[in-house]
From Swiss-Prot:
It holds the Pfam family Ldh_1_N. It catalyses: (S)-lactate + NAD(+) = pyruvate + NADH + H(+). Pathway: Fermentation; pyruvate fermentation to lactate; (S)-lactate from pyruvate: step 1/1. Catalyzes the conversion of lactate to pyruvate. Its EC number is 1.1.1.27. PROSITE patterns: L_LDH. It is found in: Cytoplasm. It comes from Listeria monocytogenes serovar 1/2a (strain ATCC BAA-679 / EGD-e). Gene3D superfamilies: Lactate dehydrogenase/glycoside hydrolase, family 4, C-terminal, NAD(P)-binding Rossmann-like Domain. NAD(+) binds at residues 14, 35, 40, 120-122, 145. InterPro entries: L-lactate/malate_DH, L-lactate_DH, L-lactate_DH_AS, Lactate/malate_DH_C, Lactate/malate_DH_N, Lactate_DH/Glyco_Ohase_4_C, NAD(P)-bd_dom_sf. One of its GO terms (biological process) is glycolytic process. Homotetramer. The gene is ldh2. This is L-lactate dehydrogenase 2.
């Protein structure tokens, strides 16, 4: 069996949190770290190797240049242009981050990369589309973490309100990984029942779905302002997506995908439900949205396309 290899490009907070999650779940044989700060990345390599030594089996933690990537299965891009300033949004990061990515991806393609790109760098949807354009790879092999973390937060919030397991909840967020994202309540259910039907039966009252959706959207910014970064949640998101790709789980996750006619749109990447396989995105699930959700999706598309046009 071919050893499974993941390269993490950017060994900052998100990259190292993802690396630690990979070590704990240990379903890859080699974890490769890439960072411009050679001293820091070597320190992280040693620290992670120590952590891996406590786990069963063998896992190699190595350091390479990004261009040394011909044998890599999944390349995770977590590079950042630096911390957000007060009042900035994810979209404010675009220009500086775009310049960094435009220097990395062509070098990787020259180095023979033929795997799958997973983008966690913000603004996720715009950078995912940029990486697809730069790489020349089929669109199914370039995806972003998108709104899978936001979807998971939504499920966690509902689970806490209802005192049930988050895995029992089918609820989704679609759109931009940012301010214009929205919950798809028309396709959300708990044990096969609409969310508020179940809530009325269990609690005797409806949940404030609007507030729950807003909380799911805003949690990332709250974490950032409280501790200076987000790392563990997105790190876990990266590892879960990779696990479903390697296993060929055929499970649908709301990740950022390049659209080509789905939802009547093209020329962008956006968070939608997608079935994952060992080749990346096997199928994009087109949900029939209600009128309000269609308007929200169109707004999110407009936000993303405006940013894409600026790079």
């Amino acid at each position: 069996m071919k050893p499974r290899k993941v390269m993490i490009i950017g060994a900052g907070n998100v990259g190292t949190a993802a690396a630690h999650a990979f070590v704990n779940q240990k379903f890859v044989e080699e974890l490769i770290l890439v960072d411009l700060n050679k001293e820091r990345v070597e320190g992280n390599r040693k620290d992670l190797a120590d952590a891996a030594a406590f786990m069963p089996g063998k896992m190699d933690i190595t350091v390479r240049d990004a261009s040394d990537c011909a044998d890599v299965d999944i390349a995770v891009i977590t590079v950042t242009a630096g911390p957000l300033k007060e009042g900035q949004t994810r979209l404010d990061e675009l220009r500086s981050t775009s310049r960094i990515v435009s220097g990395i991806v062509p070098e990787m393609m020259k180095g023979g990369f033929n795997g799958i790109f997973l983008i966690a760098t913000n603004p996720c949807d715009i950078i995912t589309y940029q990486v697809w354009k730069l790489s020349g790879l089929p669109r199914e092999r370039v995806l972003g973490t998108g709104v899978w973390l936001d979807t998971t937060r939504l499920r966690r919030l509902l689970a806490e309100k209802l005192d049930i397991a988050a895995q029992s909840i089918d609820a989704f967020i679609l759109g931009e990984h940012g301010d214009s994202q929205f919950p798809v309540w028309s396709h959300s259910s708990i044990y096969g029942k609409p969310v508020n039907e179940y809530s009325l039966e269990k609690l005797g009252e409806s949940l404030d779905l609007k507030q729950i959706g807003e909380t799911a959207r805003d949690t990332g910014f709250e974490i950032y302002h409280q501790k200076g970064c987000t790392e563990y949640g997105i790190g876990g998101t990266i590892v879960e997506i990779c696990r479903h790709i390697f296993s060929g789980s055929q499970r649908a996750l709301t990740v950022s995908c390049v659209l080509d006619g789905e939802y009547g749109e093209s020329g962008l990447a956006i968070g939608v439900p997608a079935v994952l396989s060992q080749n990346g995105v096997k199928e994009i699930i087109s949900l029939k949205l209600d009128e309000q959700e269609q308007q929200a999706f169109a707004n999110s598309v407009s936000v993303i396309k405006k940013s894409i046009a600026s790079i």
